Amino acid sequence: MIDQETFEEICHEEKLKLWTDCDEAIVGIATKRDSYNQQVVVYDRDKLVKNFMNKDGMTFDEAEEWVSFNIEGAYIGETTPLILERIDNEQPD
């Protein structure tokens, strides 16, 4: 686990891309194992949706559509952030 200061240093040194006003949804950093072994910021999809609902007053459906089109559908270079979608591990009753 890394602390906030180390995270900020890595972002600065590696010139990692961040989504504007979405810091609350950051869950970490990952390394893409391609020819560059590039580090990228990782966001939690559910937290992104909640972020837009809280900050912009969107409904759940509006925020889902916004994240799907404007975040998941965007490419902003080699350090485009990854979006983590968690697996629901709850067992049915």
Label each residue range with its predicted role.
Residues 2-93:
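C-terminal alpha-helical interaction appendages
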